[in-house]
Amino acid sequence: MGRFLLVTLSLLVGAFSLNEANSCCCPQDWLPKNGFCYKVFNDHKNWNDAEMFCRKFKPGCHLASIHSNADSADLAEYASDYLKSDGNVWIGLNDPRKQRTWVWSDRSSTNYLAWNQGEPNNSKNIEYCVHLWALTGYLKWNDTPCKALYSFICQCRF
C-alpha cells in the first residue's frame, strides 16, 4: 500500500509539473505553437504600426513568420476562428528595399512561401507588404500596400 501511494503521488507531481510547463510559456488567449506564442489582434493598423505594436510586448516579438504548410494551416484556422473571415491579416513578410526580395521581420529564413495564384504582382508598384488573404481562408498570401489597414498576428517567445 505504501509503495502504491508513493508511485501515485509521484505521478501526480509529475503531471502537475508537465501541466505547468505547457501553460507557463504563453499568456492566456495566445496560441502556443513550436516554441512561439501567437495572437491575432483585430485592431486595424498599417504594416509598420502592426510590427511596432508586436515589438512592444518584449524583445524578439514580431509579426508572425510562417515556415511550413502545417504552420500556415494552424494560423489560418486560428485567424478564421478569431476573425470569422472578416478581413485580411498582416504577417511579417515584407520587401523593405523594394527590390522584390521578401524578408521576415524577425530575420528568419524565407524557406516557405504560400502566394495566391498570380501573386506577388506588385500592382501599381506600391505593394511591399504581405497579408493572409481572407478570401482564401487565410491560407494564401497577397502583396499589398503597407499603408493598408488590417488585423495582424503577433509572434513572441514568453
From Swiss-Prot:
<dbReference type="GO" id="GO:0046872">
    <property type="term" value="F:metal ion binding"/>
</dbReference>
<protein>
    <recommendedName>
        <fullName>C-type lectin mannose-binding isoform</fullName>
    </recommendedName>
</protein>
<keyword id="KW-0964">Secreted</keyword>
<feature type="binding site">
    <location>
        <position position="142"/>
    </location>
    <ligand>
        <name>Ca(2+)</name>
    </ligand>
</feature>
<feature type="signal peptide">
    <location>
        <begin position="1"/>
        <end position="23"/>
    </location>
</feature>
<comment type="function">
    <text>Mannose-binding lectin that binds to and agglutinates erythrocytes in a calcium-dependent manner.</text>
</comment>
<comment type="subunit">
    <text>Homodimer; disulfide-linked.</text>
</comment>
<dbReference type="InterPro" id="IPR001304">
    <property type="entry name" value="C-type_lectin-like"/>
</dbReference>
<keyword id="KW-0348">Hemagglutinin</keyword>
<feature type="disulfide bond">
    <location>
        <begin position="26"/>
        <end position="37"/>
    </location>
</feature>
<keyword id="KW-0325">Glycoprotein</keyword>
<keyword id="KW-0732">Signal</keyword>
<feature type="disulfide bond">
    <location>
        <begin position="129"/>
        <end position="146"/>
    </location>
</feature>
<dbReference type="InterPro" id="IPR016186">
    <property type="entry name" value="C-type_lectin-like/link_sf"/>
</dbReference>
<feature type="binding site">
    <location>
        <position position="127"/>
    </location>
    <ligand>
        <name>Ca(2+)</name>
    </ligand>
</feature>
<feature type="domain" description="C-type lectin">
    <location>
        <begin position="33"/>
        <end position="155"/>
    </location>
</feature>
<keyword id="KW-0106">Calcium</keyword>
<dbReference type="InterPro" id="IPR050111">
    <property type="entry name" value="C-type_lectin/snaclec_domain"/>
</dbReference>
<dbReference type="GO" id="GO:0005576">
    <property type="term" value="C:extracellular region"/>
</dbReference>
<dbReference type="Pfam" id="PF00059">
    <property type="entry name" value="Lectin_C"/>
</dbReference>
<keyword id="KW-0430">Lectin</keyword>
<keyword id="KW-1015">Disulfide bond</keyword>
<feature type="binding site">
    <location>
        <position position="143"/>
    </location>
    <ligand>
        <name>Ca(2+)</name>
    </ligand>
</feature>
<dbReference type="InterPro" id="IPR016187">
    <property type="entry name" value="CTDL_fold"/>
</dbReference>
<keyword id="KW-0479">Metal-binding</keyword>
<feature type="short sequence motif" description="Mannose-binding">
    <location>
        <begin position="119"/>
        <end position="121"/>
    </location>
</feature>
<feature type="glycosylation site" description="N-linked (GlcNAc...) asparagine">
    <location>
        <position position="121"/>
    </location>
</feature>
<comment type="similarity">
    <text>Belongs to the true venom lectin family.</text>
</comment>
<dbReference type="GO" id="GO:0030246">
    <property type="term" value="F:carbohydrate binding"/>
</dbReference>
<dbReference type="InterPro" id="IPR018378">
    <property type="entry name" value="C-type_lectin_CS"/>
</dbReference>
<feature type="disulfide bond">
    <location>
        <begin position="54"/>
        <end position="154"/>
    </location>
</feature>
